[in-house]
Amino acid sequence: MQKNKAKEPRLIVGVIILMISNIIVKVIGVLFKIPLHDLLGDRGMSYFNIAYNLFTTLYLVSTAGLPTAISMMVSEARVKGKKAEVRRIFRTAVCLFFILGTIGTSIMLFGAGGLAKLMGSADASWAIMAISPTLFLICISSSIRGYFQGHQNMFPTACSEIIESAGKFILGIVLGTWAVRTGKSIEICAAYAIAGVAIGEACGLVFLICAKFLHKQDYSYTLAEDDGTVSSSKKILKNLLLISVPVMLSSVALNLTSTIDTFTIINIIKRYSSAETAEAAYGNYTTLAVTLFHLPSAFIYPISTSLAPALSAARAAENKIKERSVLSASVKMTVIISIPCAIGMALMSKPILGLLFSNEASVNSAAPLLSILSPAIFFSAILTVTSAALQACHYQRKPIISMVCGIVAKAVASCALMSIKSIGILGAPIGTLVSYFVMAAVNFMFVLKYVSSEINIFKLIIKPIVASGLASILTLTSYNAIYRAGHPTVGTVISIALTVFAYFIFLFVLKEFNRDDIMIFPHGEKIYKALVKMHLMK
């Protein structure tokens, strides 16, 4: 009994570990883009981002869904006490990832020229070749991460991601700076900078391999006795593909929002402007606005990553109460985190960008793009957590329908709007916002129909919206007061800190949290008693 009680907060522990690592990774990512943007400029960053977005798309085509499939299958086998099957799942997955990684890297390496021309920027081919080894490395890393996530052990994943990001940051800047100082062309400088991504990924893989060799399995198999049966490698491979292919298709569809931008922004804007202007607009949008848009995902990704194996384990154990508890807690956390991020980013887009990037002209261009894009943070978060829930409950095909609907909306809206010269690049974030709204709405309807009809999204969002609105008044008031005193940077930092503090105080005042919400955290009893003493809870 005590053992089960100890394991109760495992979901939230995994979320916290991944959340901390993701915040660090995202901060490193932003810090990487700031000096890189200063080195390469908007045009050089367009080559960097074209290569990186292409890599992301091919990575998703090659392997997206397989880490989720591994974590779900390992989690279910672990609950049933099947140690030997867990080992076979891992070996089968590594072999599959090795093949897929080799194919993907070959496509990028030998097809770089054609792919770059297809995206309207032939000079990006050098950057595409430089990042190509990353695809093979990340395939192997993903198989090991899926194994650990199936054990609901998020620590190796978290550490490896931090190592990768740190390596990318340090080596990317060093190589990019060296290339610029030695007078190499801007496209070659972008290739040197993006090579740091591959080297950083290699460092993370070395850590994961060491962690796998040191991992002790015995502690995880306490829920059932091993009956000695082990599925064949062929059956495991079939199950991996049955679970992962729909997940991969939905992930690819989701990534197509950025892929559509990669293919359309330069090609459409070139019709009524120069190629250099089009490349600069793409580089500005993807480096500044899109980078900040993805920053809040550091808080959401850990929830969905921890949700899939936890929900799979609850279903395998036929524990309906825990299943509902895990799902409702995940959705509630997602809503509470994403709403203030969306509102705050929309209101403070220019000060936040100005805090991070020194080029005033680039900040002025990107600020309205980020303001338009920011509401999509909420819809993206809902989409992420509902997709994880559907996939964990073996409704992997449902998110594909949502994604297809959203991609059609994105393509139509972005292309139609960007074709209007007076709208131009603004059409890209508008199309993305429409796309995420459609995908999130359709996905949530599937969750209500197939997973749980007890989630009331409107009830969940009312108090966070009210708290965010009240906190936003404080944000704007404090920022404007300090800005008028001649300290815009200080004003941005202080107003953001005050807003975060005020938001959670308002949530407690509005009685958004109950005792059960607090008890799922490690040391929940102590936290609850402290909150009662502060008169924030009864």
Language model: regions and residue ranges:
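Membrane-proximal transmembrane or re-entrant/amphipathic helices at the cytosolic face
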Residues: 477-538
